[in-house]
Amino acid sequence: MGLLSQGSPLSWEETQRHADHVRRHGILQFLHIYHAVKDRHKDVLKWGDEVEYMLVSFDHENRKVQLLLNGGDVLETLQEKGERTNPNHPTLWRPEYGSYMIEGTPGQPYGGTMSEFNTVEANMRKRRKEATSVLGEHQALCTITSFPRLGCPGFTLPEHRPNPEEGGASKSLFFPDEAINKHPRFGTLTRNIRHRRGEKVVINVPIFKDKNTPSPFVETFPEDAEASKASQPDHIYMDAMGFGMGNCCLQVTFQACSISEARYLYDQLATICPIVMALSAASPFYRGYVSDIDCRWGVISASVDDRTREERGLEPLKNNRFRISKSRYDSIDSYLSKCGEKYNDIDLTIDKEIYEQLLEEGIDHLLAQHVAHLFIRDPLTLFEEKIHLDDANESDHFENIQSTNWQTMRFKPPPPNSDIGWRVEFRPMEVQLTDFENSAYVVFVVLLTRVILSYKLDFLIPLSKVDENMKVAQKRDAVLQGMFYFRKDICKGGNAVVDGCSKAQSSSEPAAEEYTLMSIDTIINGKEGVFPGLIPILNSYLENMEVDVDTRCSILNYLKLIKKRASGELMTVARWMREFIANHPDYKQDSVITDEINYSLIWKCNQIADELCECPELLGSGFRKAKYSGGKSDPSA
């Protein structure tokens, strides 16, 4: 989760005192990197995935499942057995926000050959097996986006009570600080977001109104005036960073051949973010209730919203410099490529001084405004040992701001003094239950980048429409019911060349008829006379590539999953979870997920992930039979 400096974190007051210093030197660090590597060309498209995991413990006797707060120990063991012993170890492990979470990536990035698509799932399996092997009895590693009873009494092992007093990090009524990773960055981030904002974060998720759900659904918090004021009727109220950053996701990073190719990919993939988010929907439950959303995006956005009342437009600007329209965790606000410029229709708040400085240094308008927009934010954490840095050889101040702008896409300059290229990160996906599904989504997105670059595809639409798509994508059953703005003609005779656009696209105003509302089924699978469909385009690309039979078979299985999820033939994880709860004998049709129901659901998820049972409605019939059995969590093992 971004920069992980070691050392002594400064208080919020001290961090604030150094904010201008961090911004000033962050820009100098960016300029050093930019001038050193702006002409760097890489031959190979490298890429890698990141999977976030939750550690859980099953109490089979009392039919209860809890989040296991030993991520630190598990991580230490995995790193000791892996990368510290062998620098070429096939997996890498990193800490995540929750003390019940870990993040796993392949040890080396994948390269440009088609056969590498066949190694993704094997590597994910290796990660799952490796981490599971260091767990105790009745413990399991799960790829679940949101734990349904996160924030309910006794949801952690060991159990801890929340401490809503000022001294803590979260001050939450529901989320104990012990559930936050012990690395000083995470607790400090949590505390400083709250201090900067001037109050606790506020998350209100609409409740799903079932037959017996009270109407209006109202929770009262007599002991907490802040919560009483912030919570809304018919909404599930949450008050801590952990409710967002304590969820798991699936991300992919690509190294492009050049800075211009990275900027082009950044823009093209930004329009794909809401589509893939809806396709990967996997988080319908929050704080023990069934919600009316299927994706975590808005929850995580609110969970780290450090904007003050002035910045949110609730009070006149007095102490702050800017009105800021979005949380630091949200969709992108500007395209970076020349082709994207005319579609930049969102008002962009920028630091004008930084913008002018970047222009003077020879950086073009589009990249300058992107960086000047990121740098309207304050640093949220600062370590005493990391204040004075060598700007020519270090980038911690730049990364401090860059890595706490959590957007749908991230444009990543190379680290100083490395041979890494310009990268983009694709960030909106929800993690799936199985390695097969996670591989399918990763391979789909990576293949799409290949096709975008090979066929010079153009998905650009006004950025305000992408934002509208993001709102639709989070709704319940968006994959089947949502309509999304999408470009009609994506193959304009190879207009979208990487280093600029041809004359055919030079009109300054995007035409409204360039895009229209489509269903995800149309976007993914195509509709005659309307849109060719992304999967048919991927298939035609594959037909023209040299691909061995085995790899082709794997890729086609992955694309079949995406195709069937888009058409509704297979369920999303979110829909499947909703059906599971609705059909549970203990469910009272009141939108409440009890310990017993939660246990049944997570146990079932674990069995599906370990391939101990089939789930045709999620994965298709005839999906692989059990490959291995008797995981450590199994009561009969």
From Swiss-Prot:
Alphabetic keyword roster: Acetylation, ATP-binding, Glutathione biosynthesis, Ligase, Nucleotide-binding, Phosphoprotein
The keyword Cell membrane is assigned to this record: no
Enzymatic reactions: L-cysteine + L-glutamate + ATP = gamma-L-glutamyl-L-cysteine + ADP + phosphate + H(+); (2S)-2-aminobutanoate + L-glutamate + ATP = gamma-L-glutamyl-(2S)-2-aminobutanoate + ADP + phosphate + H(+)
InterPro entries for the chain: GCS, Gln_synth/guanido_kin_cat_dom
GO molecular function, one term: ATP binding
A Pfam family the protein falls into: GCS
Pathway(s) of this molecule: Sulfur metabolism; glutathione biosynthesis; glutathione from L-cysteine and L-glutamate: step 1/2
Modified sites of kind N-acetylmethionine: M1
Residues with the Phosphoserine modification: S5, S8
Single GO cellular component term: cytosol
Entry's EC annotation: 6.3.2.2
Record comment: activity regulation: Feedback inhibition by glutathione.
Keyword Coiled coil: no
GO BP annotation list: blood vessel diameter maintenance; cell redox homeostasis; cellular response to fibroblast growth factor stimulus; cellular response to follicle-stimulating hormone stimulus; cellular response to glucose stimulus; cellular response to hepatocyte growth factor stimulus; cellular response to insulin stimulus; cellular response to mechanical stimulus
Protein family (similarity comment): Belongs to the glutamate--cysteine ligase type 3 family.
Protein role: Catalyzes the ATP-dependent ligation of L-glutamate and L-cysteine and participates in the first and rate-limiting step in glutathione biosynthesis.
Subunit annotation: Heterodimer of a catalytic heavy chain and a regulatory light chain.
Protein name: Glutamate--cysteine ligase catalytic subunit
Organism this protein belongs to: Mus musculus (Mouse)
Gene from which the chain derives: Gclc
